[in-house]
């Protein structure tokens, strides 16, 4: 991503913008403008894909924050966004790892003292609902009476609901099976579920390993942006450490810029951690994910 073009991995700014501001889930301007911090260490979560993984593996992110006297501690890997939100609210981590906004909103609605600090948009939008080639499921309407693995209150469930609504399928006619990604993949492979709603790289690996195909692809079949990648911390941490939050936001922005300018190298880094095939990696390189 060039400095002149944020249309791909577009940082929508700090929490003064985006859906957090619309929902009243951000700090006031005065809080963001306050100087200082009460800690020199930030505990960040990471998973086996995405911006935080690349930041952790490359090391440039930590060096940039070290210039401000900030030490980074990495916690993980986590399978998806929701457990990182639990780590933040439980006090064992300071930031969620940059995941789906849907579980974040669900947590806030349930009373978690979280605030958004930053939003990211990825292109292409590759979240998909897939089924094995031998399943007889070829379109959304074929899901009636079938079971679909989704992560509860996460992007997988959100996409499935959107697909059913678009195709006018009553959600009560489809069985939602709540599984985290590490459990959903073998469930699809063994036939314990009929389909899986999932994001990259899990969905891409499953297509090849389990001979699966798309029923519904977000970027192709959905006309609107269904979700944002979001970062959250507790309101207390943000209020006490606004300078640190700004520094972390800036460091992630710099990492995103590097990824957009070095997408092929980034894919090799992601593959090493994700342990998927060269074929999947080469597909990602061809996509020029940003």
Question: Which residues make up each language-model segment?
Answer:
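Loop-centered beta-sheet repeat module
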Residues: 184-193
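Cleavable N-terminal signal peptides
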Residues: 20-21, 31
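Periplasmic-binding protein-like
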Residues: 120-131, 212-238, 245, 287-289
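Short, glycine-/small- and polar/acidic-enriched structural segments
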Residues: 34-170, 175-178, 194-200, 215-216, ...
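Stable alpha-helical elements in mature extracytoplasmic
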Residues: 57, 80, 84, 103, ...
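N-terminal secretory signal peptides and thylakoid transit peptides that target proteins
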Residues: 2-19
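Secondary-structure end/capping motifs
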Residues: 239-290
């Amino acid at each position: 991503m060039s400095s002149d073009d944020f249309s791909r991995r577009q940082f929508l700014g700090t929490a003064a913008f985006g859906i957090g501001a619309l929902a009243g889930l951000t700090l006031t301007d005065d809080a963001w403008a306050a100087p200082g911090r009460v800690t020199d260490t930030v505990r960040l979560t990471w998973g086996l894909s995405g911006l935080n993984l690349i930041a952790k593996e490359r090391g440039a992110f930590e060096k940039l924050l070290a210039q401000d006297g900030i030490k980074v501690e990495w916690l993980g890997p986590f399978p998806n966004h929701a457990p990182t939100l639990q780590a933040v609210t439980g006090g064992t981590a300071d930031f969620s790892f940059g995941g789906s906004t849907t579980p974040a909103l669900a947590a806030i609605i349930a009373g978690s003292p979280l605030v958004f600090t930053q939003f990211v948009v990825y292109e292409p939008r590759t979240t998909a609902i897939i089924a094995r080639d031998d399943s007889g499921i070829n379109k959304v309407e074929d899901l009636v009476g079938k079971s679909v693995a989704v992560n509860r209150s996460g992007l997988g469930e959100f996409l499935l609901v959107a697909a059913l609504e678009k195709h006018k399928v009553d959600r009560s006619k489809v069985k939602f099976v709540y599984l985290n990604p590490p459990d959903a993949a073998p469930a699809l492979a063994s036939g314990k579920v009929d389909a899986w709603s999932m994001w990259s790289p899990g969905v891409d690996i499953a297509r090849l390993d389990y001979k699966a195909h798309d029923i519904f692809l977000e970027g192709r079949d959905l006309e609107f942006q269904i979700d944002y990648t979001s970062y959250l911390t507790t309101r207390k941490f943000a209020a006490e450490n606004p300078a640190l939050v700004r520094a972390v936001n800036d460091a992630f922005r710099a990492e995103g810029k590097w990824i957009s300018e070095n997408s092929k190298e980034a894919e090799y880094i992601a593959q090493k951690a994700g342990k998927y095939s060269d074929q999947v990696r080469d597909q990602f390189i061809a996509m020029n994910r940003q």
